[in-house]
UniProtKB/Swiss-Prot annotation:
GO CC term (a single one): cytoplasm
Taxonomic source organism: Saccharolobus solfataricus (strain ATCC 35092 / DSM 1617 / JCM 11322 / P2)
InterPro entries to which the protein is assigned, alphabetical: Dehydroquinate_synthase, DHQ_synth_AroB, DHQ_synth_fam, DHQS/DOIS_N, DHQS_C
SUPFAM superfamilies (alphabetical): Dehydroquinate synthase-like
Free-text comment on the cofactor: Binds 1 divalent metal cation per subunit. Can use either Co(2+) or Zn(2+).
Protein name in UniProt: 3-dehydroquinate synthase
Protein location: Cytoplasm
Length: 354
């Protein structure tokens, strides 16, 4: 079990990674706590072991839950239970659950204490870290949201024991993103430890979760609210990736959309002269050895080009007639570039044609 303690803006964030880390919940056993959790998982017994008086609220784990109406129903439940600002919201589940729980915690009484307990690999390496929370609106992902840091993130490897390999792969796309843009040592570790990682070796998983958490927190600490142009690096692959998600009406898993998005954006970087020759090959090679999609033809769900291009128009990195995109320049390095909107959409059209 390993811990990270980081000061982000005005908040202290503690991350605990490793088997048995759920026991850290006992630190708040005397506090009132609402556990927002995915209906897909049986969690009550595990949580009650450390929080015998917890109030459990099940929600669906999917993009359909990330709606304002869902959050309002949760607000009503907290109001009925007389929650106050000293109480806790604990989000237990995948990225959808921690997004909703974080958004709820940030708006109720202007802020309750928040703990994230990701139960998916994607949640542990990305979604539960960084303080971004939000809900979708008009087919635009996370259009309404807040920045609100959890006081603790608990990444307990026991949740991954029964995780299907396909779910592991969906999270690996984000880990690969860190390696490509920020952390050559992580890229090399992924290159050398494929068998261990895909066989869910606990030490290997702990290593990459811990390293990914450090990488993401190092960026968030410098630019929590995306005002300095640093946090944008975490969006490599996401301009095209989010377009794929929107074009499929969110039927394409996030990790797979980002995987294809990274290839498209790496091609853009190389063709526009911002990346060293060979970067696209490096991206493709690592995605291929982990069995991740690298071409839109490998995505099962249909992707509507009109919806996808509209999502690019609505991209949060869109500024007038350009989009800010973080390009990998070589493995472990990146550069923020202003790319004309029409150029981005042109590359997107090429990438999204099956």
């Amino acid at each position: 079990m390993r811990e990270i303690l980081e000061d982000i803006c005005c908040s202290e964030v503690r991350v605990v990674v490793g088997e048995g880390s759920l026991s850290k919940l006992s630190k708040i056993k005397d506090n009132n706590a609402a556990v927002i959790y995915s209906r897909k998982i049986s969690i009550a017994d595990k949580i009650n072991k450390y929080l015998p008086n917890a109030y459990f609220i099940p929600i669906n784990d999917g993009e359909s839950t990330k709606e304002l109406s869902s959050v309002i129903s949760l607000v009503e439940k907290l109001f009925e239970k007389n929650f106050d600002r000293g109480d806790y919201i604990i989000g237990v589940g995948g990225g959808t659950v921690t997004d909703v729980a974080g958004f709820l915690a940030s708006i109720y009484l202007r802020g309750l204490n928040l703990i994230n307990v990701p139960t998916t690999f994607l949640g542990m390496v990305d979604a539960a870290i960084g303080g971004k929370n939000g809900v979708n609106f008009n087919n635009i992902k996370n259009l309404i949201g807040t920045f609100y840091q959890p006081s603790m993130i608990i990444s307990d490897l026991e949740f991954l024991e029964t995780l299907p390999i396909e779910e592991l792969k969906k999270g690996l796309a984000e880990v690969i993103k860190y390696g490509l843009t920020l952390d050559k040592e992580l890229y090399d570790y992924l290159s050398l430890n494929k068998e261990k990682i895909l066989n869910k070796d606990k030490q290997a998983l702990e290593d990459i979760i811990f390293r990914s958490t450090l990488d993401k927190l190092s960026i968030v600490k410098e630019d929590e609210r995306e005002t300095k142009g640093i946090r944008i690096v975490l969006n490599f692959g996401h301009t095209i990736g989010h377009a794929i998600e929107a074009g499929s009406s969110f039927n394409v898993p996030h990790g797979y959309a980002i995987s294809v998005g990274m290839v498209c954006e790496a091609k853009m970087a190389e063709e526009l002269g911002y990346a060293e020759e060979g970067v696209v090959e490096d991206v493709l090679w690592l995605l291929q050895i982990y069995g991740l999609p690298y071409d839109i033809s490998q995505i099962d769900a249909p992707v509507d080009l009109k919806l996808a291009l509209n999502a690019i128009n609505m991209d949060k990195k869109h500024r007038k007639d350009v989009i800010l995109i973080p390009f990998p320049t070589r493995i472990g390095s990146w550069k923020k570039v202003e790319v004309p909107l029409d150029t981005v959409k042109g590359f997107a059209e090429q990438c999204l044609k099956k």
